[in-house]
């Protein structure tokens, strides 16, 4: 029994350590929500899951140390629910960020972003005028476009140098007009609109050289936010999938050790056949 308790304690300690990357991923997304992506709701489920794993693993660790079978049982039940929630969350994150990506542009190092390339619930949420008002205000306050400017020994960046840059989705979608507008480059956030092509892209009419406006109300800016969010979530999802696989392995080990503790407490010999007519087998915690 002591060996099984030690094993359960070790598994719970390792599970506690596994909660750190999940919680760290949620905190990282939260920091980006305040400065880059400006979407402040998707990170909270991840933070809650990370904290829950921490608390439950500590309860299981205490149960193993003090041989409290109730705490061990509670760990197994709640951890099973957490694993199910993490699976659902990973599926949801992939589903809402599945479609959409930037379009390559001839002779440009950056991509252009178009809202029609995205679809689903997340696009509808970002497209909502009242919600977008909060996001665009966050983008302005974060100075996303102020950081785009560059100079070399006091010399401003030339058009050719700018065109070869790899801009982030937010910088490309919110800080410059779409390439198909045909505006002439003046500086990173200033463009000569004379002689441009006002075609079917409505963002060409929305663009403003006013530094407080730029393309914050453009559909391309909304698409850029979605593109940035997709990149962030895909990075975090890879970590979550790895953690999920390890969690499942640890859970199976903890369950086997818990069953062994119960078997010893009930004075059942190892390898006892439980499939008999008088003693049918029951699968229970």
Swiss-Prot record:
Cytoplasmic compartment residues: 1-6, 65-71, 257-285
Membrane topology type: Multi-pass membrane protein
InterPro entries: TET_plant, Tetraspanin/Peripherin
Residues the record marks as carrying a glycan: 34, 187
Keyword terms, alphabetized: Cell membrane, Glycoprotein, Membrane, Transmembrane, Transmembrane helix
Gene Ontology process terms (BP): auxin-activated signaling pathway
Summary of the function given for this chain in its UniProt record: May be involved in the regulation of cell differentiation.
Family designation: Belongs to the tetraspanin (TM4SF) family.
Identification of the protein by name: Tetraspanin-3
Organism name: Arabidopsis thaliana (Mouse-ear cress)
Primary gene name: TET3
């Amino acid at each position: 029994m002591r060996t099984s308790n030690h094993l359960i304690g070790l598994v719970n300690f390792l599970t506690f350590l596994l909660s750190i990357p999940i919680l760290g991923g949620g905190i990282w997304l939260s920091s980006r929500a305040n400065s880059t992506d400006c979407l402040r709701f998707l990170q909270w489920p991840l933070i809650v899951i990370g904290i829950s794993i921490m608390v439950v693993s500590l309860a299981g660790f205490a149960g193993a140390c003090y041989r409290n079978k109730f705490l061990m049982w509670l760990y197994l039940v709640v951890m099973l629910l957490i694993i199910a929630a993490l699976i659902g969350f990973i599926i949801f994150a992939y589903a809402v960020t599945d479609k959409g990506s930037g379009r390559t542009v001839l002779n440009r190092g950056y991509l252009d972003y178009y809202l029609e390339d995205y679809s689903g619930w997340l696009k509808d949420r970002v497209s909502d005028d009242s919600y977008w008002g909060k996001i665009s205000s966050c983008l302005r306050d974060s100075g996303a476009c102020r950081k785009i400017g560059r100079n070399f020994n006091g010399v401003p960046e030339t058009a050719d140098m700018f065109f070869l840059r790899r801009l982030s989705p937010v910088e490309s979608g919110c800080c410059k007009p779409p390439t198909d507008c045909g505006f002439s480059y003046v500086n990173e956030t200033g463009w000569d609109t004379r002689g441009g092509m006002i075609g079917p892209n409505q963002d060409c009419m929305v663009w403003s050289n006013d530094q407080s406006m730029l393309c914050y109300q453009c559909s391309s800016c909304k698409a850029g936010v979605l593109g940035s969010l997709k990149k962030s979530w895909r990075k975090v999802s890879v970590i979550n999938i790895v953690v999920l696989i390890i969690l499942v392995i640890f859970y199976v080990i903890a369950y086997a050790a818990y069953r062994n503790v119960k078997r010893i407490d009930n004075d059942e010999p190892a390898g006892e056949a439980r499939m008999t007519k008088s003693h049918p087998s029951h699968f229970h915690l």
